[in-house]
Amino acid sequence: MNRTSVGEVSGWVGLARSTFYYKPLPGRRGKKPSTHTLYKGELVSNYQVIEAIRSLISGPYNAYGYQSVNEDLRELGYWINEKKTYRLMDQHRLLLGKVIRCQGKRTWVQYRKITASKPLEYLCLDIKYVWVHGEGRWYYLLSIMDVFSRKILHWIFQKSVRKVDVINMLRLLHLRYNLKGVIIRNDNGSQFLANQVRSLLIQLEARQEFTHVATPEENSYIEAFHSILQRELIDRYEFNSYYEAKRHLEQYMQWYNYQRKHKRLGRITPHAKWMQGFPCSAVKQSDPVDVE
């Protein structure tokens, strides 16, 4: 049996010999995007760059595009080009002109300061970034507080907080407490603006209200809690891993709710204030903090 070499066959059909051996690989071609950026001579996580970008464009009238942001980043000491700046801003929905379109009109905050006369009258929620030193990246903490008692009813700590996480959290809270008639205050984050989140709250007969842009004081209770958390826990520890950070958060939340006394509550704990609102309900008094 006569055999013909690959080179001969390739020559007959007019193809390069290398074509025979080529096997395309799955996934996108080219070099993988970098996960770190050079900052003042040291490699830092891209999450630090993203936080720097958020800070640069945080002003209420700031309309910087990615090119202006790139110039500012380089002035701060980041060794980064426009292409990478664009990619990071695009991935995190920070590009100018990225508009979140939601169905129906938003109900805006009417009164800057919330006055709650009972538990589950007002809830407020917000997202905070927590730096995990050992992994060189940020994690997201979503907390929801009962305004009357300042008690943290639920919190989520993970790599990202999506609309599905907010939906699951609201469903869990509804099963435990019944959110009918509850007013829920939040900022204008994409997770809270999502049509599915707004539709769920309508279905649960809860009322959602949005703070005005660049007015964190309208959500002052949860903002104050996150400031306390920053001062009493995050600034005092360097977390080596996600699991270590989560363990510290679990312990802190328990301590905050059940042991930390608040001057504005009359020198009692959030849980004690919560109990005052349910003098005849053992179920409401004993509800623990939910952790995910």
Residue spans for each PLM region:
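Electropositive, glycine- and tryptophan-enriched low-complexity nucleic-acid-binding patches
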Residues: D146-I156, M169-L172
